[in-house]
């Protein structure tokens, strides 16, 4: 199975073009003001002009209300919602109902977490996928850290691997976890929110190599 890839935290049109040219399946836009990768609605609208059909646009939100997300959707054509905060399964269901979008939940893999149970809770709530990310006591994603990949389960729901991925380790990551998709942000950056074209290309080459083996 071909492993999908999302380049997240894009803020510049040239980075969209680099990701698309390299073969990314999805582009992630961050709507969380504390993040250095946050984009305004105006920025997002401009970036969308460079994203072709068949490349999904994922909007990342952290503990946002349905009304806050809808205010973005009124202006920005997002395909999928990535809920990356402390949203409960019930809150995710309500957001999906009101926003009428597919969604997936990001789960930070804490040392004591029962990963299978947590994934199944969100699967039962209607998640179209679940993203497993490294845990950090203060940050919501983009930590640059990875978790113990041996904890990556095999379940009947698409699972996305995130956290500390780079061009150097993505082949091993895919072969170890057999993830449905991989999600990278800091691993392909020259600076926070500024992607590096060559790193994106090398990362996507690694994704293709890892999928083929």
Curated annotation (Swiss-Prot):
Q: Does the keyword Amino-acid biosynthesis apply?
A: yes
Tell me its EC number(s), please: 5.3.1.24
Under catalytic activity, the entry for this protein gives: N-(5-phospho-beta-D-ribosyl)anthranilate = 1-(2-carboxyphenylamino)-1-deoxy-D-ribulose 5-phosphate
Pathway(s): Amino-acid biosynthesis; L-tryptophan biosynthesis; L-tryptophan from chorismate: step 3/5
Name the enzyme's class.
isomerase
Annotated GO MF terms: phosphoribosylanthranilate isomerase activity
One example of a Gene Ontology biological process annotation = L-tryptophan biosynthetic process
The family database entries (InterPro entries) matched by this protein are listed as:
Aldolase_TIM, PRAI_dom, RibuloseP-bd_barrel, TrpF_fam
Enumerate the UniProt keywords alphabetically: Amino-acid biosynthesis, Aromatic amino acid biosynthesis, Isomerase, Tryptophan biosynthesis
Protein family membership: Belongs to the TrpF family.
* Protein name per its UniProtKB record: N-(5'-phosphoribosyl)anthranilate isomerase
In which organism is this protein found?
Acinetobacter calcoaceticus
């Amino acid at each position: 199975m071909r492993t999908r890839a999302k380049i997240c935290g894009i803020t510049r049109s040239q980075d969209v073009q680099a990701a698309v040219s390299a073969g990314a399946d999805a582009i992630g836009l961050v709507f969380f003001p504390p993040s250095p990768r946050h984009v305004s609605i105006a920025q997002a609208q401009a970036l969308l002009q460079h994203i072709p059909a068949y490349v999904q646009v994922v909007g990342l939100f952290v503990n946002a209300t349905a009304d806050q997300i809808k205010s973005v959707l009124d202006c920005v054509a997002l395909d999928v919602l990535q809920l990356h905060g402390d949203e409960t399964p019930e809150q995710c269901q309500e957001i999906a109902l009101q926003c009428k979008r597919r969604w997936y939940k990001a789960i930070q893999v804490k040392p004591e977490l029962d990963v299978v149970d947590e994934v199944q809770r969100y699967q039962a709530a209607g998640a179209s996928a679940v993203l497993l990310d490294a845990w950090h006591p203060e940050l919501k994603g983009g930590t640059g850290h990875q978790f113990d990949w041996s904890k990556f389960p095999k379940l009947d729901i698409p699972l996305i691997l995130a956290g500390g991925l780079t061009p150097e380790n993505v082949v091993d990551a895919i072969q170890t976890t057999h993830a449905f998709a991989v999600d990278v942000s800091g691993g392909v950056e020259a600076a926070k929110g500024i992607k590096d074209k060559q790193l994106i290309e090398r990362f996507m080459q690694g994704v293709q190599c890892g999928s083929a083996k």
